[in-house]
Amino acid sequence: MKKEDVVAGMLAYIAHLREVGRYSTAKSYLDALRSFKCFCGMEEIPYAYIDKERLLLYQAWLSKRGCMRNTVSTYMRRIRHIYNLAVEAGEVSYIPNLFKGVFTGVESKRKKALPLDSLRSLMGTPRVEPEMRRTQLCFCLMFSFSGMAFVDFAHLRKENVKDGVLSYHRQKSGSFIRVEIPVSYTHLRA
């Protein structure tokens, strides 16, 4: 089946991603598609419609709408990937340097660290209301477990703790993580 336009090509790829269980990546492609359709003002976008000038206009449009550079880059890389798939399938002719000048890099984020006094206050204040105490304890554990994401914390089971080591798979990436449990938390073993 030929997918002569960007929308059809991206929807087919999104369906493939969902079939193989890559739901977060599929959502990223869907977000990029919705944004590009909004910019173009069309439901069907032929590959011929994509040119360097239009990509630069789209980049500027995203920036004006308040998108961060990494979001702009992600959307552009999604479009570039679908375009490259179409080139490989012979649906569109290759245009050299089509994405040259378009930001597709990754900008490192400035870490927003909590001041030490605030961290001590959050972790050491036992004077919180009883209904907030559990939240405070969860925060302390997540911080102590190398800044564990809440979604990973929520999926933990007793089986994840063995011999003073917490082992789990990240929900976001599926990567395997092993964290040595600080001595002060060894009473958590089941």
Predicted regions: what they are:
Residues T186-A190:
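Conserved small/polar residues in nucleotide/adenosyl-binding loops
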Residues M1-E4, E19:
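N-terminal helical hairpins
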Residues L98-F150, A154:
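Basic, Lys/Arg- and aromatic-enriched nucleic-acid-binding interface segment
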Residues L11-S24, L33-R110, T125:
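N-terminal core-binding DNA-recognition domain of tyrosine recombinases/integrases
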Residues T104, D163-Y185:
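Basic, Lys/Arg-rich DNA-contacting stretches centered on the C-terminal catalytic core
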Residues N84-V92, M142-D163:
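Short, charged phosphate-coordinating catalytic segments
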Residues R65-C67, Q136, S167-Q171:
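Glycine- and acidic
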